[in-house]
UniProtKB/Swiss-Prot annotation:
Biological process terms in GO annotation: translation
InterPro entries assigned to the protein according to its UniProt record, in alphabetical order: Ribosomal_uS8, Ribosomal_uS8_CS, Ribosomal_uS8_sf
Primary role: One of the primary rRNA binding proteins, it binds directly to 16S rRNA central domain where it helps coordinate assembly of the platform of the 30S subunit.
Pfam families in the record: Ribosomal_S8
Gene3D superfamilies linked: 3.30.1370.30, 3.30.1490.10
Protein name: Small ribosomal subunit protein uS8
GO MF, one example: rRNA binding
Family: Belongs to the universal ribosomal protein uS8 family.
Organism, as annotated: Buchnera aphidicola subsp. Baizongia pistaciae (strain Bp)
Keyword Ribosomal protein annotated: yes
Keywords: Ribonucleoprotein, Ribosomal protein, RNA-binding, rRNA-binding
HAMAP family the UniProt entry points to: Ribosomal_uS8_B
Oligomeric and partner information: Part of the 30S ribosomal subunit. Contacts proteins S5 and S12.
Length: 130
């Protein structure tokens, strides 16, 4: 049985791992998941991640906590395979008045909402993180 939405699965694994106070979560890897992980690390939402390529590539994300509480309070999928959500550069949403991030897939790669605004790019809204 194939997975219908691998990005939603990734976000759910991160959310469930943090609720269970896990050190890390493991999932199948893809280029898009690695790019999302890079953004989450740059923005300080996760400690680190690694990709292990034995037979099938596996992505391991090391979760981050502050005073024994998860750094990620909320992580939700916006665009799904059945309902794609796009936004122009002047209509990009903000999470918690700019305290959170929106991850967007643009023509120049996967970017946060702040970087996409500076570059004047719109695209598919992948998820919100706060």
């Amino acid at each position: 049985m194939s997975m219908q939405d691998p990005i939603a699965d990734m976000l759910t694994r991160i959310r469930n791992g943090q609720f269970a106070s896990k050190i890390s979560v493991i999932m199948p890897s893809s280029k898009l998941k690695v790019k999302i992980s890079i953004l989450l690390k740059e923005e300080g939402y996760i400690k680190d991640f690694s990709v292990n390529s034995t037979n099938k590539p596996i992505l391991e994300i090391f979760l981050k906590y502050f005073r024994s509480k998860p750094v990620i309070e909320n992580i939700t999928r916006v665009s799904s395979p059945s309902l794609r959500i796009y936004a122009r550069n002047n209509k990009l949403p903000q999470v918690m008045s700019g305290l959170g991030i929106v991850i967007i897939s643009t023509s120049q790669g996967v970017l946060t909402d702040q970087v996409a605004r500076k570059k004047g790019l719109g695209g598919e809204i992948i998820c919100n993180v706060s």
